[in-house]
Amino acid sequence: NIMQEAQDQNFISDHTKIDVRTKVINTTDASGKNIYNYDVEVSYTVDEEYSATDDFAPGRFKCEESNAALAMLAIVKKALTGDFSKYMVEGKQVKVQITGMADALPFRRTVAYDGCYGDFDQEPVYKNDELSNITVTEATGISENEQLAYLRAMGVKDYLDRNIPAFGKMRTTFDTYIEVSQNKGGAYRRIGVKLTFVDAL
């Protein structure tokens, strides 16, 4: 069991709950062929009294700055190099949906962005499931929660690029989703990942 092993190795603490949901979806491809896609969705929650230590602090976006985010990504890595590696087939199609979330805490000033994930100019992004675009560069810095949510998502992409080389051999597409809550608090500053292995079964 991935979760148990991760807990034993202290990837995750008792107060971070990581949820891995899988489902098989019967659909048809572009040519009308009947195929089965395999969906893997990973999310997490943190016990309220630990949110301040384990969730992203206000204005923070690097995965390393959230114990819970890093724990979730460690689980994703473990799954993709272990139990789910049989779906990581060279030349096969995988769709990766990454979600960055931000809360409603207003910005008092622009926060510096060190350009660690590159500059983003008019990049396509799904905001509340509607296709939109976003700009955040070292020069602009971060002045709104949408940008913060986007950089949290880019941290996920960066982690996957660095830790799962198999994606480079697959036909991998990344879609970025951002969610900005009306509420304030660490519970609304999180990340999520959904993988769809196309024609996997």
For each feature predicted by the language model, list its residue ranges.
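Extracytoplasmic/secreted proteins, especially bacterial periplasmic and envelope-associated proteins
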Residues: 67, 71-79, 151-155, 159
